[in-house]
């Protein structure tokens, strides 16, 4: 995979150095549909992913999901997680305080949010999600000094996801009712980081 590309979203991932993790070197690479659409669509059609993302279908379904994030003025940046040179996860880093999510919890200015899916089944169930969540959250907090916390809202039925967030240093705040799911509001505070 070549060097990261410029992107339209609010998160400056293009100049973020890769993160060293126990699973390998992780780099966030902004999504480019011409390069990434087929792979992301394939991941969205994996039954485990489709059960919670609800974006199964042809590539047009995935393209329609990505389009608003790739347009100017978006508060969300879609990225591939490239682990030791292999694209293996999909991320959405977003300003939670500007998102519809802010209507469902006491948002603070500059709250960031994270969505994650592990693309290939061989990477699931081995603690990789926890490792990647910890690394990406640290990247966000390292590069966005006004952000005091990172939030997530996995479906409460997605026990492996909730567990990964907890193991990555997030705390369970409350359950919230969103239009598409009942979610576990997970929060990782800057003040509770395990490293400087």
Name each model feature, range by range.
Residues 125-141, 163, 167:
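Conserved acetyl-CoA-binding loop-helix of GNAT-fold acetyltransferases
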Residues 1-34, 194-196:
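Conserved N-terminal entry element of GNAT/NAT acetyltransferase domains
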Residues 68-113, 117-121:
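Acetyl-CoA-dependent GNAT
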Residues 150-162, 179:
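Conserved beta-strand-loop-alpha-helix junction that forms the acyl-donor binding cleft
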